[in-house]
Design a protein with these regions (language model features):
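Metal-dependent nucleotide-binding catalytic modules
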Residues: 1-113
């Protein structure tokens, strides 16, 4: 999720790629530590934009996280393709970002092994 968020952010105006990576990473943190995401956001020193994206799917980061989750779950019919194309995220760009993110994640896991 973090790798895909970072890849998509590279095509999303106004969203920093490393912030997007952090967003994707932290969006799954509650599953790893068995603490509700709300409590984690209160304890961690995150920017307001990250907190709002994680808790309410607000702002551009929230929209990005929603997109990443829909892509993960293959909810293609729920995507607003016209809106995505307006910001430069055509289907081929998204497809390439997805494949690149899978490769990034594999390389990351291999580097940690």
């Amino acid at each position: 999720r973090a790798c895909l968020a970072r890849r998509l952010a590279g095509h999303w105006p106004g969203i920093d790629q490393e912030t997007a990576f952090t967003l994707g990473l932290f969006s799954l943190l509650d599953a790893f530590v068995d603490i509700p995401l709300k409590h984690l956001c209160e304890k961690l020193n995150l920017s307001d934009s990250l907190k709002n994206a994680l808790m309410r799917r607000a702002g551009g980061l929230g929209q990005l996280l929603t997109l990443v989750q829909k892509l993960e779950q293959a909810e293609w019919d729920d995507l607003d393709w016209y809106a995505l194309e307006q910001i430069g995220l055509q289907a081929d760009v998204i497809s390439s970002a997805y494949v690149d993110a899978l490769n990034d994640a594999r390389e990351l896991v291999e580097a940690l092994a």
